[in-house]
Amino acid sequence: MTDTPTKQEITSKNDKVPGAIPGEQKKNNRNNDRKRNRRGDSKNLERDSDWQERVVQIRRVSKTVKGGKKMSFRAIVVVGNEKGQVGVGVGKAGDVIGAVRKGVSDGKKNLVRVPLTPNNSIPTLSKGRDGAANVLIRPAAPGTGVIAGGSIRTVLELAGIKNVLAKRLGSKTPLNNARAAMVALSQLRTHKSASRERGISLEQLYS
């Protein structure tokens, strides 16, 4: 007469952990997954909290289609972490919130890393141009502040620059000025990198 295996013996053979009940093991696995997801979400929130967003302009725009005019919103957004990274983005959507959200996403895709000096200024003078807008930025002494206006000021502040002089020439369009400022910031080089590119020492660079 053969012995019939008990329920406990069957479950112990099927489970990875001997003697464990399948339902309890699945429940423990789900709890562990939730804990890992929470830890991952908290890290993402910490990274996102370092970034700031400022809306430079929101305009209502229209597009002529076959059935008439299609209205939408365009948002110009500047994103930065005030630690040397900044970006300008443009978003279009049927509502303002959607346009701003797309602008933030576009700005984070076009980030520029800015070399900052110990007194939160820029190392050298720089120029940038976008369309008919020209922007000139130059370093300033500690305590000067951000001497700039419009969208240029927003870009410089979110980049983490606290002492700088900026001058706008040509077009007054917020988007062109913001992009011209981005071009000027992207051309900045530290003193060491400038001397390395030119193949001379720091003493020869300033002699």
Swiss-Prot record:
Source organism (scientific name): Prochlorococcus marinus (strain MIT 9312)
NCBIfam families documented for this protein: rpsE_bact
Xref: PROSITE patterns: RIBOSOMAL_S5, S5_DSRBD
Compositional bias ranges of the Basic and acidic residues kind: 24-51
Domain S5 DRBM span(s) in chain numbering: 51-114
A biological process from GO: translation
Record's protein name: Small ribosomal subunit protein uS5
Organism classification: Bacteria, Bacillati, Cyanobacteriota, Cyanophyceae, Synechococcales
Function, in words: With S4 and S12 plays an important role in translational accuracy. Located at the back of the 30S subunit body where it stabilizes the conformation of the head with respect to the body.
Gene, per the UniProt record: rpsE
Subunit structure: Part of the 30S ribosomal subunit. Contacts proteins S4 and S8.
Organism superkingdom: Bacteria
